[in-house]
């Protein structure tokens, strides 16, 4: 009788089990800006961003096993030592592993596959989590949000502004497309097809 095949450990398991922030300098082997991505998906944004910004220490959350493992594997093979992928729900881990005012930027990539109005209670950006993220971001830090669902984008923008994030373009205004920004795998499809993407680039006051 053959033995059952053991499943590999989740990517970034050591971070999932930590109760306090790790020594990020020791983890990455260098110091530099620390950035968080929630919802890295297929990894297009995280991988390209880390290629363009080798000075940044980038921590990406993705709860889908295939995407999380594939992204970390591709980063390792490409020699990107500045990317760590965590295969888990960011809402439960972020509160424990990042100190207050420690993040230079937060990237929120096309969250919430449950896009119907009746699914709003499942949305990642709720007031309590938005307030927590605000506390983790350093003064002057950037919150970069992108979604393809306009109603959800309007709601998230309102929540984020309500907890203190400032919109340089004015309250409730989405940010226009900037070709210098790094698109995600999903965003590239929308850019190619001409479908709209709703973006916001918010700041925490210095």
UniProtKB/Swiss-Prot annotation:
Q: CDD domains, from UniProt?
A: AdoMet_MTases
Q: Which GO terms describe its cellular component?
A: tRNA methyltransferase complex
Which residues are noted in the entry as substrate-binding? 116, 148
Record field: catalytic activity: guanosine(46) in tRNA + S-adenosyl-L-methionine = N(7)-methylguanosine(46) in tRNA + S-adenosyl-L-homocysteine
Q: Which pathway does the UniProt entry assign to this protein?
A: tRNA modification; N(7)-methylguanine-tRNA biosynthesis
Record-listed S-adenosyl-L-methionine binding positions: 37, 62, 89, 112
UniProt KW Disulfide bond keyword: no
Keyword S-adenosyl-L-methionine found = yes
Active site as annotated: 112
Task: Please name the InterPro entries in this protein's record.
Answer: SAM-dependent_MTases_sf, tRNA_(Gua-N-7)_MeTrfase_Trmb, tRNA_methyltr_TrmB_bact
A GO MF label: tRNA (guanine(46)-N7)-methyltransferase activity
Q: Which UniProt keywords apply?
A: Methyltransferase, S-adenosyl-L-methionine, Transferase, tRNA processing
> Known EC number(s)?
2.1.1.33
Top EC category: transferase
Q: Which family does it belong to?
A: Belongs to the class I-like SAM-binding methyltransferase superfamily. TrmB family.
**What is the annotated role of this protein in its UniProt record?**
Catalyzes the formation of N(7)-methylguanine at position 46 (m7G46) in tRNA.
Q: Which HAMAP family match?
A: tRNA_methyltr_TrmB
Q: What is this protein called?
A: tRNA (guanine-N(7)-)-methyltransferase
Q: Which organism is it from?
A: Myxococcus xanthus (strain DK1622)
Q: What is the lineage of its organism?
A: Bacteria, Pseudomonadati, Myxococcota, Myxococcia, Myxococcales
């Amino acid at each position: 009788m053959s033995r059952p095949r053991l499943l590999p450990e989740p990517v970034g398991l050591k971070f999932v089990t930590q109760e306090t922030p790790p020594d990020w300098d020791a983890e990455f082997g260098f110091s530099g800006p620390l950035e968080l991505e929630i919802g890295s998906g297929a990894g297009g944004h995280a991988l390209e961003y880390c290629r363009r910004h080798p000075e940044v220490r980038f921590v990406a959350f993705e709860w889908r096993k295939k995407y999380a493992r594939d992204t970390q594997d591709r980063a390792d093979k490409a020699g990107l030592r500045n990317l760590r992928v965590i295969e888990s729900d960011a809402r439960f881990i972020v509160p424990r592993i990042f100190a207050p005012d420690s993040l230079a930027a937060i990237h929120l990539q096309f969250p919430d596959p449950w896009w119907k109005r009746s699914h709003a209670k499942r949305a990642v950006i709720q007031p309590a989590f938005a307030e927590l993220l605000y506390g983790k971001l350093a003064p002057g830090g950037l919150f970069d949000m992108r979604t393809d669902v306009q109603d959800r984008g309007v709601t998230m923008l309102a929540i984020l502004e309500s907890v203190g994030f400032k919109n340089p373009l004015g309250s409730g205004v989405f940010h226009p497309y900037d070709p210098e920004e790094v698109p995600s795998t999903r965003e590239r499809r929308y850019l190619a097809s001409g479908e709209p993407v709703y973006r916001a680039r918010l700041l925490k006051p210095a």
